Regions:
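Charged, terminal alpha-helix-loop-beta segments
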Residues: 1-105
């Protein structure tokens, strides 16, 4: 619930200054084995020719967040990516910083 204003601001920021970004979805639902999962923001970058998945976290980054993003990236590789496109990129943005764990996939 607290993430929604941040999601909107990030979406606006990327669409205004990010070259090649096209909005795909907010709280994008994917279904695997009859279970629903939600990715905070999904963009497609025409210049990079790949999906960009963004997950927002209110706390510090931990290993389960990284595993979750890898899960989303694998789903997009298998189900959304076309043969002529590059592999998706994942970004995890956290409200709290941990110097050891910072991720961009």
């Amino acid at each position: 619930v607290g993430q929604h204003p941040i999601i909107g601001q990030l979406q606006y920021f990327l669409l205004k200054i990010g070259k090649g970004f096209s909005f795909v979805g907010r709280q994008k639902r994917i279904t695997i084995a009859n279970r629903h999962y939600y990715i905070d923001l999904v963009f497609y970058n025409r210049l990079l020719r790949c999906f960009v998945l963004i997950d927002l976290k209110t706390g510090e980054l931990d290993h389960s967040d990284i595993g979750q993003m890898n899960f989303y990236l694998n789903y997009f590789k298998e189900n959304e990516k076309h043969e002529d496109e590059n592999e998706p990129i994942g970004l995890i943005l956290c409200a709290k910083k941990d110097d050891i764990l910072q991720s961009m996939f």
